[in-house]
Amino acid sequence: MNELKTKFSHKLQRFWAALLDIFGPRKVAVFCVVILTVMMLVLTISVRSCSGIGGSGGNNTDPAISERDTITSKVTGKQLPKTASGLKNEADRLAASYDYDKALALVAEYESAYDNAEDCSAYKQELETQKAQCSRWEDTTHVPHIFFHSLVADTDRAFDGDGEEDGYNLYMTTISEFNAIMEQMYARGYVLVDIHDMVKQVKTDDGKTVYKQGDIYLPEGKKPFVLSVDDVNYYKYMTDGDGDGYADAKGDGFAHKLVIGKDGKVTNEYYEKDGTLVTGSYDVLPLLEDFIEKHPDFSYRGAKGILAVTGYEGVFGYHTHPDWKKKLTSDEYNKEVKQAKAVSEAIKKQGWTIASHSYAHFGYGSADAYKLVDDVQKWEDQIQPIVGDTDVLIYPFGEDIAGVEDYSGAKYKSMYDAGFRIFCNVDASQDYWVQIHDSYVRQGRINLDGYRLYHSPDLIKNLIDAKTVIDSARPTPVPSI
């Protein structure tokens, strides 16, 4: 054996001597580095190919994936990579939003793609354990509903001492305040739910379909809430400084439109003070999307908020009101409508609900039945074809058509016949107010605006600490109502 080793050693020495003689020391050194690099690359690929869901075993985990290495999941409808890591990332995201059943279904859908069944089994057990730690929310009539108007993006322009300042100071919230509110509610264990999660429709023994309390399952310490935004129309008095009907930098520092960004997600258009037109997160929708992306456990099964729109100035910042047919060419007007429809579809695809905020924005409670019926009809004729069907009506000025008594009469019949089943007023006197009737649902909403933050911090102390939220750029004292 020693003799063989000696012979091999002599041959190896002669081999290296020949290489050095032919190529020189520098080239031989480069050659050695290349050989070592290739060996390390091969070793790395081999290790990755053995990584499964739990970190060992399984195939198809190379992160460099081509289009043919993806699959459209029947569970989520998303295009996902056919890799263990891709599966786990998506399943983890679903589990983080408390959608354990969908996460388990996704694992089952992909399970056959992996060699290591033991790792799949362990991961499924982990999901089952998390699911078991959730319990049904005891009473969905105990769910608060907070709301905002369009957010102040530029406090210098909004609070500039003109005739609109007091209104903005009373009824608007700044971006800084909104972000702080979301952070505090998240820290306190609040979880955003869809308003439809609060209820479910069931059939009775006599064949009737009625509303009952919904099934919301959350871990201990978590509590549900609903969020809505009023007047997501981007009215011209807020965005058009020179009065020509189009948004400009002379506006009062608000976003002026919802658009579909390059990534396919809904975002804002906004004019900077210097006239630069930009897109980004300047209002509730994209800001909340950003927050949920960072904190997926803030959203229950992908729930988002409600956007309430009127009709007298078009929707989402687009010139869809019939009066614009006189000012635009047919092609220009049709383009506005088409874009507004596309944005509406994208909004709903992202998990948001679009609600009616009336057509002309007057108090439904104090109006006579004839005026209300006409308003509902205008909504159906002009706005519903753009935003689609909705069963949620958010009362303008928060003015309900009744007190605590049951709905009845021509006003209710008109709204019911138009498809509305969930009705939201404003009631900040208590943490929550919900009525669930056989054929409709009512919920009170709490305004988190300048007036509420400044004048009634004790009424919202279970939600936030208003004193630490209020923006230093907000003029004080905030006017009284």
Language-model features, listed with the residues they occupy:
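Functional beta-strand-loop-alpha-helix junction segments that form "active/interaction loops"
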Residues: 199-204
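N-terminal Lys/Arg-rich, disordered targeting/topogenic segments
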Residues: 1-26
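N-terminal, intrinsically disordered, polar/charged segments of Gram-positive cell-envelope systems
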Residues: 51-136
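Hydrophobic membrane-insertion alpha-helices, especially the h-region
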Residues: 31-45
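Metal-dependent polysaccharide deacetylase catalytic core of the NodB/CE4 family, i.e.
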Residues: 141-161, 207, 211, 219-225, ...
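Membrane-interface motif at the C-terminal end of an N-terminal transmembrane signal
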Residues: 42-54
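C-terminal active-site subregion of NodB/CE4 polysaccharide deacetylases
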Residues: 104-120, 128-198, 211-227, 235-239, ...
